[in-house]
């Protein structure tokens, strides 16, 4: 499958798994936004700490604005391979195109580690 238009860098599987784990921890001990509308609002308001975007969103235009918006607001973002994987990590029974960690809770150190690795990938 060709890479979607909004995917700007490749994320190693281990790092994507760590990001999904951080989302699960934040969901239980902090606060997360689920769905592209909620995520867009969290980014626009500058309250998102980390944005997670699924790589298999169809049509791509649903989330194509998120990387640009996140960069503009200086909020780190990462890609997760599938909507189903992202939805499960967000505590949903269905897939989701995007999710954001708003309050890290116990995932704070893990999020810092992920952000450092994402910055290296973007270089």
UniProtKB/Swiss-Prot annotation:
Disulfide bonds: none annotated. Gene3D superfamilies: 3.30.1330.30. Pfam families: Ribosomal_L7Ae. One of its GO terms (biological process) is tRNA 5'-leader removal. The keyword RNA-binding applies. One of its GO terms (molecular function) is structural constituent of ribosome. One of its GO terms (cellular component) is ribonucleoprotein complex. Keywords: Cytoplasm, Ribonucleoprotein, Ribosomal protein, RNA-binding, rRNA-binding, tRNA processing. It is found in: Cytoplasm. The keyword Endoplasmic reticulum does not apply. Its main location: cytoplasm. Transmembrane segments: none annotated. Part of the 50S ribosomal subunit. Probably part of the RNase P complex. Belongs to the eukaryotic ribosomal protein eL8 family. Multifunctional RNA-binding protein that recognizes the K-turn motif in ribosomal RNA, the RNA component of RNase P, box H/ACA, box C/D and box C'/D' sRNAs. This is Large ribosomal subunit protein eL8. The lineage of its organism: Archaea, Methanobacteriati, Methanobacteriota, Methanomada group, Methanobacteria.
């Amino acid at each position: 499958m060709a890479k979607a238009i909004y995917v700007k860098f490749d994320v190693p599987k281990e790092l994507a798994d760590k990001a999904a784990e951080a989302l699960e921890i934040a969901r239980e001990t902090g606060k997360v936004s689920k769905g592209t509308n909620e995520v867009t609002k969290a980014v626009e308001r500058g309250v998102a700490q980390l944005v997670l975007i699924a790589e298999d969103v169809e049509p791509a235009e649903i989330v194509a604005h998120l990387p640009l918006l996140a960069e503009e607001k200086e909020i780190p973002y990462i890609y997760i391979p599938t909507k189903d994987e992202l939805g499960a990590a967000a505590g949903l029974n269905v897939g989701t195109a995007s999710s954001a960690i708003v309050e890290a809770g116990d995932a704070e150190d893990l999020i810092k580690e992920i952000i450092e690795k994402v910055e290296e990938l973007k270089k």
